[in-house]
């Protein structure tokens, strides 16, 4: 059994690949796949977003190379940003 961090990394990889490739490139998330992933894995984050275009905005921000899809590296940027925000929130309120 790996460390907590190794397990977290494996989970991140598995979550990405569980949602990618249903509509094309198996190494990227389409807009629909990203939306499904966010609804499944980060539903409380989406619930807080009152903006109906939240997924479109997230997709636009993440898609650094402009190909209309989110690759693993671009996805990790989202997870890292959310993790930093959560860290700041939880440590400031503890």
Swiss-Prot record:
GO terms for biological process: negative regulation of transcription by RNA polymerase II; positive regulation of sprouting angiogenesis; regulation of heart contraction. Its main location: cytoplasm. GO terms for cellular component: A band; cytoplasm; cytosol; Golgi apparatus; I band; M band; mitochondrion; nucleoplasm. Glutathionylated; glutathionylation increases affinity to calcium about 10-fold. Ca(2+) 1 binds at residues 28, 33. It is found in: Cytoplasm; Sarcoplasmic reticulum; Mitochondrion. It comes from the Eukaryota. One of its GO terms (molecular function) is calcium ion binding. Keywords: Calcium, Cytoplasm, Metal-binding, Mitochondrion, Repeat, S-nitrosylation, Sarcoplasmic reticulum. Dimer of either two alpha chains, or two beta chains, or one alpha and one beta chain. Also forms heterodimers with S100P. Interacts with AGER. Interacts with CAPZA1. Interacts with FKBP4. Interacts with RYR1 and RYR2. Interacts with CACYBP in a calcium-dependent manner. Interacts with PPP5C (via TPR repeats); the interaction is calcium-dependent and modulates PPP5C activity. Interacts with ATP2A2 and PLN in a Ca(2+)-dependent manner. Interacts with mitochondrial F1-ATPase subunits ATP5F1A and ATP5F1B; these interactions increase F1-ATPase activity. Small calcium binding protein that plays important roles in several biological processes such as Ca(2+) homeostasis, chondrocyte biology and cardiomyocyte regulation. In response to an increase in intracellular Ca(2+) levels, binds calcium which triggers conformational changes. These changes allow interactions with specific target proteins and modulate their activity. This is Protein S100-A1. It comes from Rattus norvegicus (Rat). The gene is S100a1.
């Amino acid at each position: 059994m790996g460390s907590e961090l190794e397990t977290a990394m494996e989970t991140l990889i598995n979550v990405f690949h569980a949602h990618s490739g249903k509509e094309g490139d198996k190494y990227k998330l389409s807009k629909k796949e990203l939306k499904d992933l966010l609804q499944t894995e980060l539903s409380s984050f989406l619930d807080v977003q009152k903006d109906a275009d939240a997924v479109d905005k997230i997709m636009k921000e993440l898609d650094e190379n402009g190909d209309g899809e989110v690759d693993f590296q671009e996805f990790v940027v989202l997870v890292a940003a959310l993790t930093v925000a959560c860290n700041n929130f939880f440590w400031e309120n503890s």
